Amino acid sequence: MSATNPFFAPKTALITGASSGIGLELAHLFARDGYRLVLVARNRGALRELATELQSRYNAEVWISPKDLAHPASPLELYQELQESGVVLDVLVNNAGFGGEGPFLNTDWSAEAEMLQVNIVALTHLTKLFLPQIRAREGKLLNVASTAAFLPGPFMAVYYASKAYVLHFTEAIAEELSGSKTTVTCLCPGPVKTNFQKRAGIADSNLLHGPLLVEVQEVARIAYDGMKKGKRVVIPGWKNRAVVESLRLSPRRVTPKVVRRLHEKKQ
């Protein structure tokens, strides 16, 4: 881990998957509001570039920690680094995650195992490690799921299931902490143009060429505002909220067929 300045102020936020997309935009919002930041991602160069920008624009204090959360040891290593540095969190943003497309019979298990490690195991482990100090400081937890969390996902079966875990896990913790001043929020964005789509192999999906698309800056702003207000579930875009509700009310045998059509590629 590398530091730019020691941490003296009480408000510190850790963001995983901070080098691009929603995580990057959230880093800007936290820095704008005076938070000290711990930024985690695989790409050391991108983290350094972001840290420099945040320092220049907001005079932010930033630590970067290049970590691949697909490695089971990474969450504990990160926790121990912060413990040794005397850094205590007020906010944890579990944003890191990725997906993959293809019929389950044909997809690669090693890629899916990494997906489960990042999307589920690392998120849960980081929450287990940092939630005690966040609760002690009456802080906030923001977990990033997806509108996929509400639905079965043909051709992205493991990804959709992993996001259902994140949603239910987050809602359960929110209820457990409902008597405290600590808030727990789950962000469930619909389609957003980020590097996620390229990695998942869905850059030409119908989802990214329709009315459900919300710009990444807007998703981050809505997520940030929802977290500050202590909302349990945040779905950016009224059309996404409407689609989720309508599909949840549809017969269970119908919903997978609708989702399958949404993932069909443009011809």
Where are these regions (language model features)?
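Residue(s) in the substrate-gating loop at a strand-loop-helix junction
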Residues: 146
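Conserved glycine-rich Rossmann-like NAD(P)H-binding loop of the short-chain dehydrogenase/reductase
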Residues: 33-50
